[in-house]
Structures are given as C-alpha cells and as structure tokens.
C-alpha cells in the first residue's frame, strides 16, 4: 500500500446500523488465509438471492451500477460488531473499499482494519446524517478524505474528524508496528546487551 495522504472516490451509502461481521462475510467463506479473493463474498447474503451467487439482489445498494466502483462506504453506528474475523476486513479491501465512514465501529473490527490498512473515519451521528442527506440527493457523488488536514469534503461542505495520531502517522508514511520496531532495532540490541543478569532467563543465567 502507498502512503495515504488523500483519497477521493465514489461513496456508497449503506444506511444500516449494527452491521455485524457475519453480514459482512458469512462464516462459510472463512476457510482461506490468503487475503485476496474475498471481495466476491462481501455482504454475500444481501448481494445475492441464492447461495450460488447466480441471482443478483438488484435492490441492494452495491448492486446498483452507479456504485460499482465505489471506494468509500458510508454507514451507521456500530459497524463491524459481532465475532472477530479478519476476513471481514479482507473482503472490504478486496472489493475495493479504501475508507469506511461511520458514527462508530466495534473495537475489534477497528483494530483489525487499521492493522490491514483499511482507513476508518468516525464522525458524530449528526454529521453522518448530514452526509447521508447529501449522498441520497446526489447519487454517485464523490467524497474526499484528507489525512493531513483531517477533513472529509463532500459537495463543498467540510467535516472535521479526529484520528489517533499513531494510526494517522502510520497511514501517512505507510508503516506499521513492525516497521516501527525495526526502526528501533539498534536501541533494542543495545538494551538486550546491557540487560542486568537478574532479568535473564534461567538458561542464560547459567551461562554467565
């Protein structure tokens, strides 16, 4: 993934609260561990009218042609609730979503998303309702997300959001926990070489 500074894309409105991970991707599709290929199972039971994916549910928002290239999902509170499954995040990313905007997310889904570089933007419910109003009156409209300024811009209106600074820096610089640890490797080695003997494990202590 490249550094995330700003993204502009079509926003798809999913006007549903408490979307759980089983709705995002049903349990029968969790067998693989490769992060690719899960997009076709995203919202499976809502997108299709049969288990074989032969009958499309034309009423579902993502099946409307105007949203076929949507990269931003707008939804309501408590998105990603239910059981912890990283596949839910993988399916959203593989489908093509880069950003999800909602009034709240489940804690586990929130952490899984950031660990996989899916950007989650939290706005209060009044702001979310305002954006829904704009989107419903302007089908297929774009939204711009700017991480340098912490702004959501749509239809010449600006909404400010807050994001944990650590996560923000990770997105802006395309780094993660491992990268940060590796950047401190010299300091870690110095510490380990100077650790007091009484903190060593039993095997290491005997060698001294």
UniProtKB/Swiss-Prot annotation:
Record InterPro entries: 3-IsopropMal_deHydase_ssu (IPR004431), Aconitase/3IPM_dehydase_swvl (IPR015928), AconitaseA/IPMdHydase_ssu_swvl (IPR000573), IPMI_Swivel (IPR033940), LeuD (IPR050075)
Record GO terms (molecular function): 3-isopropylmalate dehydratase activity
Enzyme Commission identifier(s): 4.2.1.33
Assigned GO CC terms: 3-isopropylmalate dehydratase complex
Entry's transmembrane regions: none
Catalytic reaction list: (2R,3S)-3-isopropylmalate = (2S)-2-isopropylmalate
Pfam families listed in its UniProt record: Aconitase_C (PF00694)
Keyword list, A-Z: Amino-acid biosynthesis, Branched-chain amino acid biosynthesis, Leucine biosynthesis, Lyase, Plasmid
CDD domains assigned to the protein according to its UniProt record, in alphabetical order: IPMI_Swivel
Recorded metabolic or biological pathway in which this protein acts: Amino-acid biosynthesis; L-leucine biosynthesis; L-leucine from 3-methyl-2-oxobutanoate: step 2/4
Family indicated by similarity: Belongs to the LeuD family. LeuD type 1 subfamily.
HAMAP family assigned to the protein according to its UniProt record, in alphabetical order: LeuD_type1
Task of the protein: Catalyzes the isomerization between 2-isopropylmalate and 3-isopropylmalate, via the formation of 2-isopropylmaleate.
Subunit structure as annotated in this protein's UniProt entry: Heterodimer of LeuC and LeuD.
Protein name according to UniProt: 3-isopropylmalate dehydratase small subunit
Organism: Buchnera aphidicola subsp. Diuraphis noxia
């Amino acid at each position: 993934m490249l550094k995330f500074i700003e993204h502009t894309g079509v926003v798809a409105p999913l006007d549903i609260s408490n979307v759980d991970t089983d709705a995002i991707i049903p349990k029968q599709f969790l067998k693989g561990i490769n992060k690719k290929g899960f997009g076709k199972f995203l919202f499976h039971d809502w997108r299709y009218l049969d288990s074989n994916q032969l009958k499309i549910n034309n009423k579902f928002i993502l099946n409307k042609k105007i949203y076929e290239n949507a990269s931003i999902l707008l939804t309501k509170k408590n998105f990603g609730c239910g059981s912890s499954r990283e596949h839910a995040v993988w399916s959203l990313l593989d489908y093509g979503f880069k950003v999800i905007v909602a009034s709240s997310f489940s804690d586990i889904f929130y952490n899984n998303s950031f660990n996989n570089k899916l950007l989650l933007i939290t706005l209060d419910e009044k702001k979310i309702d305002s954006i829904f109003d704009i989107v419903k009156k302007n089908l297929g409209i774009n939204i711009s997300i700017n991480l340098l300024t912490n702004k959501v811009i749509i239809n010449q209106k600006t909404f400010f959001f807050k994001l944990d600074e650590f996560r923000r820096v990770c997105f802006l610089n395309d780094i993660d926990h491992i990268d940060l640890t590796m950047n401190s490797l010299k300091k870690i080695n110095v510490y380990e070489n100077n650790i007091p003997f009484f903190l060593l494990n039993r095997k290491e202590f005997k060698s001294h």
